[in-house]
Amino acid sequence: MNGLTVVFAGTPEFGLPCLDALIQSRHHLKAVYTQPDRPAGRGRKLQESPVKEWAINHQIPVYQPLNFKNQEAVDELSALKPDVMVVIAYGLILPKAVLEIPRLGCINVHASLLPRWRGASPIQHAILHGDAESGVTIMQMDVGLDTGPMLCKAACPVTSSDTAGSLHDKLAKMSVKPLLDVLEALASNSAQFELQNNELATYAGKINKEEARINWHQSAVEIDRKIRAFNPWPVAYTLAGELMLRIHQAKATDIMSTEMPGMILNIDKNGMLVATSDNALLVEKIQFPGAKIISVRDWLNSGKTQLHTGLMLQ
């Protein structure tokens, strides 16, 4: 049985473990599609995507169409004659004409247990909503948004200390085996498809920077989830006077508070206790504008005074 001719489409780091596995598998990785280089950083220099960097390092041809609205981009893909297209966080919508090019269709590695958390930010939403588990789903793509039939699922627990960053890394690594299993099933014509139950579907919309501001009138547990869901981006923040204070790490406590939500109750070597709508939140790692991430203990030892008991965080 011959290996499959695979075209990969992806942009961020999430797809790299699968790319590493693909190139070592019996399948033939013929080309990589990724988004065009974008200006990034203070200098606004054009930056290649992690997937493009990987492809160049492994001498795999790279294609970067702006979209697939023009026939030339569609014909270019068609000329590669792929058996299957593997799509992981590509960030471009694939029209029906593209989905029909590969002999075995396009399969997508999605970072949730579908039909829960269809959409752009499944990892963040799993943490925001306190899900006990997350996982990856390999599905056959159709013209809907993450609505296609499922080929394989793999689950993992979401811990109380997981951030979007740590869960991202776990899911990226654990997606390798399900993807390879699905490719083998497709190659041997033994793949089994399960339709999604649309009644159970939830939607994970794109996360915006504007959502990162902490609302101290929420519960300590809800704020803790937000801080973890928005780490490493866009990072939850509050205002200490006129200063933006980013909060990188915190945890809900069982310390009841009757003070106004947002009031700093205490600062010591263990962290900064802040009142919420119920129990206090213990803030452990912070960042002031233009400064490095620092523990509250180290900030306390620095002798600085921007934060103090009784200050209202907004």
Swiss-Prot record:
Transmembrane segments: none annotated. (6S)-5,6,7,8-tetrahydrofolate binds at residues 112-115. CDD domains: FMT_core_Met-tRNA-FMT_N (cd08646), Met_tRNA_FMT_C (cd08704). Gene3D superfamilies: 3.40.50.12230. GO terms for cellular component: cytosol. The keyword Transferase applies. Pfam families: Formyl_trans_C, Formyl_trans_N. Keywords: Protein biosynthesis, Transferase. The keyword Protein biosynthesis applies. Its EC number is 2.1.2.9. It catalyses: L-methionyl-tRNA(fMet) + (6R)-10-formyltetrahydrofolate = N-formyl-L-methionyl-tRNA(fMet) + (6S)-5,6,7,8-tetrahydrofolate + H(+). It comes from the Bacteria. InterPro entries: Fmt, Formyl_trans_C, Formyl_transf_N, Formyl_transf_N_sf, Formyl_transferase-like_C_sf, GART_AS, Met-tRNA-FMT_C, Met-tRNA-FMT_N. It is an enzyme of class 2 (transferase). GO terms for molecular function: methionyl-tRNA formyltransferase activity. Belongs to the Fmt family. PANTHER family: METHIONYL-TRNA FORMYLTRANSFERASE, METHIONYL-TRNA FORMYLTRANSFERASE, MITOCHONDRIAL. Attaches a formyl group to the free amino group of methionyl-tRNA(fMet). The formyl group appears to play a dual role in the initiator identity of N-formylmethionyl-tRNA by promoting its recognition by IF2 and preventing the misappropriation of this tRNA by the elongation apparatus. This is Methionyl-tRNA formyltransferase. It comes from Legionella pneumophila subsp. pneumophila (strain Philadelphia 1 / ATCC 33152 / DSM 7513).
